[in-house]
């Protein structure tokens, strides 16, 4: 593949990927009011909310909470509900009806849901991002949301069913987005709009519970079910909720995740050799996001890539920001690419020898007693695997599990220190022994030399997905990278990047057989003599 970050084997080992990165339905009746075009800052609105419910100190003192509710639909009792929250970012809701239960939960690692029918499923994409975002916000009553690398901006002032309200959008660079409504009159939170999960919620009848004001009426508009009214029966604080109640349900039988990961790792050399026989199209999208979560700039590059044995793939730029290269620039690009092929042909014996040396070195290390690749060995040493389970993903059976640092683990070096801060979830095809999807993020900030050399903020994240072709070969489909980094004394910045791969085409990867045609042709077969 063209770069280390595009290599399926490296993408499998989320620890190594992040080490590499270090180095290199809407709310009803929302009409806009005739209020002034300027609004209070998001921080001020949130501070006023915290004062209204009892103060920041009292809110932070609530380490966990359990509330019990009665569910009504059109004034008829339908069931009961339980909502559980635990700092720093865990949330579980359970609604029990006569015909079953609806359960959903989120932690910083993963989010999952179990409906009235079907098995539990691990959420992905915008659904998962929204669920994780809400868990972080609600578990701490919005206190110190910035420390979790969450952004906030005031969108507008609307006339809601509960009166004038400021609409504040909270977002993460990984795609989480929620809109909270705060009453202009009382400063209390009166609504949440979740477009990703097609849900809107209204909060009413605030009354004291312990040291805080809590809503005693909750109206939830779930897509396709109508409006459910929940009435608070009781709430308790700091009961010492176990973190395990937020974990996904595990499989009934024991699943050996360690053995499965070792098989996946050993399978990679053969898989990479097959992948290196394909050309493909790569689309890179880079976004500049400001401190309020607004995309200020987006650039898109589309290229064709041609793998070279034992060497980085040759990349041929096709377009930028949707515009094909001019004839003059295309000619220069073709000349540059042809020169790269010629150099690869000239160096192919040297490249082959280097590849053999690397292979021999790996064999030597394995003969000394370590049967694992270095990356997977560190990963297995540092991490434990939570709730291994069976799920359907991409219309195939998969084994899914969360991962986090082992309790009490003491890192011995910088790589282990970084891996120990990782959390996430992995989907594996148990038949083909391939990673189908991987999500990893930093639960804590990471610094080198006390932050003088490099500093990564919490929430730095990577997700990747592979897809299976009809001939059984697995290919990367996309990778998303989001992080805020500071490098030495040169400042830093935010990286928000998506790489998508498509149009895989098989051909012989012999350097001497390459001949590049015009940029308009996308058939690699036509580019050979």
Where are these regions (language model features)?
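Structured extracytoplasmic
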Residues: 31-164, 174-176, 240-241, 249-422, ...
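Aromatic-rich beta-strand edge motifs centered on tyrosine
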Residues: 104-107, 158-159, 180-185, 200-211, ...
